[in-house]
From Swiss-Prot:
InterPro entries: IGPD_sf (IPR038494), ImidazoleglycerolP_deHydtase (IPR000807), ImidazoleglycerP_deHydtase_CS (IPR020565), Ribosomal_Su5_D2-typ_SF (IPR020568). Disulfide bonds: none annotated. Its EC number is 4.2.1.19. It catalyses: D-erythro-1-(imidazol-4-yl)glycerol 3-phosphate = 3-(imidazol-4-yl)-2-oxopropyl phosphate + H2O. The keyword Lipid metabolism does not apply. GO terms for biological process: L-histidine biosynthetic process. Pathway: Amino-acid biosynthesis; L-histidine biosynthesis; L-histidine from 5-phospho-alpha-D-ribose 1-diphosphate: step 6/9. Keywords: Amino-acid biosynthesis, Cytoplasm, Histidine biosynthesis, Lyase. It comes from Burkholderia lata (strain ATCC 17760 / DSM 23089 / LMG 22485 / NCIMB 9086 / R18194 / 383). This is Imidazoleglycerol-phosphate dehydratase. One of its GO terms (cellular component) is cytoplasm. NCBIfam families: PRK00951.1-1, PRK00951.1-5, PRK00951.2-1, PRK00951.2-4. Belongs to the imidazoleglycerol-phosphate dehydratase family.
Length: 195
């Protein structure tokens, strides 16, 4: 089983992430940021990743450090669970609609961190959640998972729908990329022989 647990403690946050890449989408989430919990639930359910996240952060200031550090810790946990990346499909993509919103996410477990994030949010906040923090979450993830990630919201009027389609598509793209390919068992999915 491809499981990992990572604990990250700083002066700003204390975070624990436990995941099973070959799960069924079960989750236990307590980040102290309700909208982030809602988005992590999308990753778990659509990625079929069993996911536990506990976070305590300086949310009395704002949610920035908690959201960013959860992204970092999730990236570390995914990288640890995948290990040497042998046998994975490496690439994944997904389009997800929600009413008027449509997003596309493409991921490459290349070993080269990179983020292209193009979401023209229609408002700055979803409830109390600052939509700019979604960029910080994904930046933290890509830098610590070692992936290239392209996120595009192709259309949308409702900011909640825009971001929810992004997280659902991310979960589905992640699931596709980390899936084991029986025909490539034990092989690194690269002509270089390493990722």
């Amino acid at each position: 089983m491809r499981v990992a647990e990572v604990v990250r403690n700083t002066s700003e946050t204390q975070i624990r992430v436990k995941l099973n890449l070959d799960g069924t989408g079960q989750q236990k989430l307590a980040t102290g940021v309700p909208f982030l919990d809602h988005m992590l639930d999308q990753i778990a359910r659509h990625g079929l990743v069993d996911l536990e996240v506990e976070a305590h952060g300086d949310t009395h200031i704002d949610d920035h450090h908690t959201v960013e550090d959860v992204g970092i810790t999730l990236g570390q946990a995914v990288a640890k669970a995948i290990g040497d990346r042998k046998g994975i499909r490496r690439y994944g993509h997904s389009y997800v609609p929600l009413d008027e919103a449509l997003s596309r996410v493409v991921i490459d477990f290349s070993g080269r961190p990179g983020l292209e994030f193009h979401v023209p949010f229609t408002r700055a906040r979803i409830g109390t959640f600052d939509v700019d923090l979604s960029i910080e979450f994904f930046r933290g993830f890509v830098n610590h998972a070692g992936v290239t990630l392209h996120i595009d919201n192709l259309r949308g009027i409702n900011a909640h729908h825009q971001l929810e389609t992004v997280f659902k598509a991310f979960g589905r793209a992640l699931r596709a990329a980390v899936e084991l390919d029986e025909r490539a068992a034990g092989q690194i999915p690269s002509t270089k022989g390493s990722l």
